[in-house]
Curated annotation (Swiss-Prot):
Pfam families registered for this protein in UniProt: Glucosamine_iso
Family membership: Belongs to the glucosamine/galactosamine-6-phosphate isomerase family. NagB subfamily.
UniProt GO cellular component terms: cytoplasm
Protein's name in the database: Glucosamine-6-phosphate deaminase
SUPFAM superfamilies associated with the record: NagB/RpiA/CoA transferase-like
One GO term of the biological process aspect: N-acetylneuraminate catabolic process
Organism, as annotated: Listeria welshimeri serovar 6b (strain ATCC 35897 / DSM 20650 / CCUG 15529 / CIP 8149 / NCTC 11857 / SLCC 5334 / V8)
Length: 234
């Protein structure tokens, strides 16, 4: 596990972009795994400004809310289109279908996509409870793409994106921890003091399902990029 501490979110995002650009330029990155939320927003803004050619790059996404149409402004389809896909051309892009009526079939479909498009670099954020994707504490390290019941703390953290608290979905489709660990390389981004405890447990704590991100200690190629605040407890 390589640890990089930067001055702020912009510097950290630029460092992540350097790794991604190099992988695309050398042809090592054919599939790029993407995350959502506030953490990668600056990375995507920098990627849009970059001259790197992404027209031969396929993207996959970690998760999507259950019950939201792709056109819903709170969906991750909408988020990705708004921040990245409408501004930068990719070969093809895959996300779970939030409107799927058969959850089991949708999870199997998405896992098949991940098998057909092995992820070369997976970008991750981390929740204050150590979740990666929507894999909450207690999730099996052997999990594949699955339907998740969102915890109160995760819904609380995400309610700022919704007009009303009751509008925050209760379920999501998420790549499983095993699905994430199948990526050849992982870049974990964390910025801000509120992520410091989760980062401490991820890097220095035991590998335990109560901190899902701690499983990254077992991955052969992880780069953790932090700002000074997120690194403050290390």
């Amino acid at each position: 596990m390589q640890l990089i501490t930067t001055e702020n979110k912009l510097a950290g995002s630029k460092k992540a972009l350097e790794i991604i650009e190099k992988g695309i330029t050398t042809g090592e990155v054919n599939t790029l795994g993407l995350a959502t939320g506030s953490t990668p927003e600056t990375l995507y803004a920098e990627l849009v400004k970059s001259d790197v050619d992404t027209t031969n790059v396929t993207t996959t996404n970690l998760d999507e809310y259950v019950g939201l149409a792709a056109s819903d402004p709170n969906s991750y389809h909408y988020y990705m289109n708004n921040l990245l896909f409408s501004k930068k051309a990719f070969k093809e892009s895959f996300l779970p279908n939030g409107e799927a009526t058969d959850a089991e079939a949708e999870c199997a479909r998405y896992e098949e996509i991940l098998t057909e498009h092995p992820i070369d670099i997976q970008v991750l954020g981390i929740g204050t409870n150590g979740h990666i994707g929507f894999n909450e504490p207690g999730t099996s390290f052997d999990s594949l793409t699955h339907k998740v019941v969102l915890t109160d703390s995760t819904r609380e953290a995400n309610k700022r994106f919704f007009e009303r608290e009751e509008d925050v979905p209760t379920h999501a489709y998420s790549m499983g921890i095993k699905s994430i660990m199948n990526a050849k390389k992982i870049i974990l981004l964390a910025f801000g003091e509120n992520k410091a405890q989760a980062i401490k447990e991820t890097i220095k704590g035991p590998v335990d399902v109560n901190c899902p991100a701690s499983v990254l200690q077992n991955h052969p190629d992880v780069t953790v990029i932090l700002d000074n605040e997120a690194a403050s407890l290390l």
